[in-house]
Amino acid sequence: MPTPSLASLPIRRLTLRDQAACADLSEDRGWPREEHKWGFLLTAGKGYGIDDPDGGLVSACVVTEYGPQDPALAAIGMVLVAGRHARQGVGRRLMRHVVSAMGATPLTLHATPYGRPLYEELGFKVTGRAEMVRGYFTAGGPEPRVATRAATAEDLTAILRLDEQVFGADRTHIVTRLPAFADQLRVAEEGGQIIGYAAAWPNMDTHVVGPLIARDTSVAQALIASLAARTDRPLRTDIDVRHEELLTWVKERGLESLAFNSVMSYGITELPGDWSRRFAPVTVAAG
């Protein structure tokens, strides 16, 4: 029986049953397996993929929608093509399918330099940049005098309200999964009001800090320091490059620059919400 051409292989929705196959695809491309993250994204978002007739996946990606009925925004991430099928138009075909399926919904994604030309070809525009930093956090110098504590169930309403103001869209289905997904979820308080929150979730040998929502840089610093004090793993996070003060601060405390990604959008000229209080995404794959 002849092997079907890549162009004829159907695109289907992925489910949590595809978690291991998605992790295999990550590994195939030299990425960490990140099974914990794949599980989170496949349950909170919509996965799309192409099955390989020889087993596994040819390609995959995940779309995370924000907004209860008509999404105000959708983030595309984890766009991967198996090495043996690279540079044959598979990623382009999958992306075109996703863009078409999302209709009029504004889209965003974080692009590596490798992926950016494809996204530009599809009509995405660069609207910002994020810097990935990683390392063991070493406390030093005057620390911000901002009170932080572990979040409780009673904080959820206030966290959701703050998050929607800052993110610019309803992320209830993401935020409510954080207590199970993350190893730490902490809030910053002033006068009984929550002025920021952050999570640290396990990813291979690191703890990823995200989301990081804070009233200002000093609150963001306090949240990072409080998360770092409660883990023996290196931290990793992706910080909007406009937050120069925070980037300088984390680098002075042991984190090093790993890479820059372009923040791109489709159907909107800039992301909704308040970037000045949005320091890091939950993951670059979900915004």
Language-model region placement:
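Basic, Lys/Arg-rich alpha-helical nucleic-acid-recognition elements, primarily the DNA-binding modules
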Residues: 7, 13-14, 25-46, 56, ...
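Conserved catalytic-core motifs of GNAT/GCN5-like acyltransferases
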Residues: 68, 106-110, 125-139, 257-269
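Intrinsically disordered, low-complexity, positively biased terminal segments
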Residues: 1-6, 15-20, 52-53, 64, ...
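Surface-exposed beta-loop interaction hotspot
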Residues: 127-163
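Conserved active-site tyrosine of GNAT-family acetyltransferases
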Residues: 119-120, 124, 250
